[in-house]
């Protein structure tokens, strides 16, 4: 069953975030993932959630998403994102058909 990594990002260092974005597509693909949402228009429907940017990645399964996030290859890239702004991230299982 597919799993999704959902990341809310508020960028404070555009140059560093641009560098981060150069490295992520290849790493995401290496772990079987793909971008489903990469920014774009948002509309708050409930609560006070007003994200400036949302990214959704799809992986073949929960374990693949964890392998990507916890991988030694991603660690230095993740550090770039964490220095380039504030973020929140979760992994969630998809719906079994």
Regions found by a protein language model. Name each.
Residues 65-91:
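C-terminal structural segments of small proteins and small subunits
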């Amino acid at each position: 069953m597919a799993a999704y990594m959902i990341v809310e990002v508020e960028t404070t260092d555009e140059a560093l975030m641009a560098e981060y974005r150069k490295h992520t597509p290849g790493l995401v693909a290496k772990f079987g993932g793909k971008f489903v949402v990469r920014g774009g228009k948002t509309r708050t429907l409930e609560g006070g959630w007003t994200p400036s940017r949302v990214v959704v990645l799809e992986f073949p399964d929960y374990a693949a998403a964890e392998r990507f996030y916890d991988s030694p290859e991603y660690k230095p890239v993740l550090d770039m994102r964490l220095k380039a702004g504030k973020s929140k991230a979760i992994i969630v299982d998809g719906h079994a058909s």
